Amino acid sequence: MIYKIFYQETKERSPRREKTQALYLEIDAETELEGRIKARKLIEEKTAYNVEYIELLSDKHLEYEKETGVFALTEL
């Protein structure tokens, strides 16, 4: 499953929509909820990012992301 994680680079400042960034992670999980939990845990262990939202990408959404040229899997 591929998840899109919306985040702020630091937890020190309050979130601002204009500074929200996104990354893509491939997570091995049996359910969407399990994948979200694993993704959040991985981000918290490996980065100082402030996670705002974690979204499971459907096949159509993934194709759209690939077509726009912004899609790149992140390895942590």
Swiss-Prot record:
Source organism: Streptococcus uberis (strain ATCC BAA-854 / 0140J)
One Pfam family cited in the UniProt record for this chain: RpoY
Family that this chain belongs to: Belongs to the RNA polymerase subunit epsilon family.
UniProt GO molecular function: DNA binding; DNA-directed RNA polymerase activity
Annotated EC: 2.7.7.6
Reactions catalysed according to its record: RNA(n) + a ribonucleoside 5'-triphosphate = RNA(n+1) + diphosphate
Gene assigned in the entry: rpoY
Subunit structure: RNAP is composed of a core of 2 alpha, a beta and a beta' subunit. The core is associated with a delta subunit, and at least one of epsilon or omega. When a sigma factor is associated with the core the holoenzyme is formed, which can initiate transcription.
Record-given protein name: DNA-directed RNA polymerase subunit epsilon
Alphabetical keyword list: DNA-directed RNA polymerase, Nucleotidyltransferase, Transcription, Transferase
